[in-house]
Amino acid sequence: MLELKTHRLAIPIVLFAGLLWSFGPLVVRYMDNPNQVPWQYIFGRGLTIFILLNLYLYFEEGFNFYKNYKKVGKSGLLGGCGLGVAMISFIYSITNTTAAITLLCLAAMPFFTALLAFLFLKERISLNVWISIIVATIGIIIMALGNTEKSSIIGFIFGITSSIGFSVFSVTLRWRKETPKFTTVAIAGLFCFVVATFMILIKNQPFFATSFNSSMFSLHGTLVCLGLILYSIGSKAIPAAELTLLSLTEVIGGIFWVWLPLFGINEIPSTNTIVGGFFLFVSITYYSLIMRWNKRYIALN
């Protein structure tokens, strides 16, 4: 894999990865009635992610890439399932509430990760991180209080579930650091594909939606894969603190694209979402400053 050792080159690459991911909510909003074909979306997106990541691994490592599957172990399977649940929850969240709610729930992932690592890996949480978690929790509660409609509450719950699923993936990587990251994500794609296949058969539905929707499903999967590859290249040269801040590109961009009248969606966040989001951004910024002081580095290998 291409490795960047200079901070100056790594930052724009990670920013571009976040920019690619930020178009995900816009792609979903352009779909025709995605709430009526969630399993077809999960089927198409999961299959796209599985195929593209295996192709990338093949070109990166040659035919021996399949040996990565022998190395995943329990951590890889658990992480893949956690990530798969996150992907499934994402579509149910964003089709039942605003993109802002879904994305801000995902922005709380570092704090769920810290709590899970504390519970299962016995990682110590400092007082400053607890402060960040409390501030983030206040923001999440404020957003939850603004979701009074039944469908919006369901979307919020699925958004939190998606964030926890991503956190499970992150914690499993800490649990066993030699777990192949890309292979674990490919397993998540396969998990989505298998679960969606099962649900489609039970519901006696077609596997594919309209040609337009199917292309949107694959486009979203492609954006996820390309962003992941670029993120993995740039993340090796960037401290975790800066990565946390740079990851906000996805959140800010995702909210901005669905609001921008140019794209025809014009989805405006509610007051509670804006206030709760402000608390989340404050907590993430504070958390990033703490991480910077600790000089911690993370990366996808």
Where are the language model's segments positioned?
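Transmembrane alpha-helices of multi-pass small-molecule transport proteins
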Residues: 34-85, 112, 165-169, 186-203, ...
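Membrane-interface helix-cap regions at the ends of transmembrane helices
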Residues: 2-4, 49-70, 136-151, 191-213, ...
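C-terminal-most transmembrane helix of multi-pass membrane proteins
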Residues: 3-4, 46, 145, 248-301
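Hydrophobic/small/kink-forming positions within alpha-helical transmembrane segments
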Residues: 22, 26, 80, 84-88, ...
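Hydrophobic transmembrane alpha-helices of multi-pass small-molecule transport proteins
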Residues: 53, 116, 125-145, 164, ...
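Glycine-/small-residue-enriched transmembrane alpha-helix faces in small-molecule transporters
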Residues: 1-44, 81, 148-175, 216, ...
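Loop-to-transmembrane-helix transition segments
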Residues: 9-17, 57, 64-89, 128, ...
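Helix-helix packing/entry segments at the starts of transmembrane helices
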Residues: 18, 44, 102-108, 173-192, ...
